Amino acid sequence: MTKFASSFAAVAVILSLTGIAAQAQEGPWLVRVRAVNLDSANKDSTGLGLSVNNRTIPEVDISYFVTPNIAAELILTYPQKHKIYSGSTEIGSLKHLPPTLSLQYHFSPTATFRPYVGAGLNYTNFSAVNFVPAVQTALEPTIKYNSVGLSLQVGADIQVSKNLYVNLDVKKVQIGTTVYSKGAEAGKFKVDPLLVGLGLGMRF
């Protein structure tokens, strides 16, 4: 009985070490490529009924796992162009570049289905802001070109092979600006988009 117990304990230790080794072989880096639908909240206090169009954009994120459960994620894309509307009338366009850095908690880091939550900071730079000549002449509009806000996130990675994952990700991001007319503040415009993304990830 003692020999059996000792043998069982030895097998248990070996299996445990094998599991740890298998987990250790999974690299700390995870790179995802996603198609993201950007749905703007369009909260406007200028009285002009400002809004920007919704669109689908490409996105790349790079995650580094500090522990099996905790990761830092940096989200990148190139400057995205949006049309600016007043009511239903197009009055201009702009580009925005919105890198976001988040800290994530992954609930089941060794399972096939790996849900996570995250929170972080978004920095958005607005550029190439243009208005149609009639609006430019009448209002001389300008905007604040930088925005800093919070980001909340929920998502899941689904393992489909050793290093390949399907990813579903949902974020709510605070993005806004101050609108000026002839040098005076006219109000605030908040994009505050809901971002729903689907893509693939590679772990290494």
Model region roles, listed by residue range:
Residues 1-27:
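Cleavable N-terminal export/targeting peptides
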Residues 2-5, 10-12, 54, 62-64, ...:
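Domain-scale selection of a single, long terminal region
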Residues 26-27, 37, 61-134, 193-204:
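Gram-negative (and chloroplast) outer-membrane scaffold detector with strong preference
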Residues 32-34, 61-65, 153-155, 165-167:
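Short, conserved structural micro-motifs that define repeat-unit consensus positions
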Residues 33-61:
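N-terminal targeting signals for Sec/Tat export/insertion, comprising classic cleavable signal peptides
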Residues 42-52, 80-96, 123-146, 175-191:
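Flexible, solvent-exposed loop segments that connect beta-strands
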Residues 99-101, 118-123, 146-156, 172:
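Hydrophobic alpha-helical segments of small multi-pass membrane proteins
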Residues 159-204:
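Hydrophobic secondary-structure block in the mid-to-C-terminal portion of proteins
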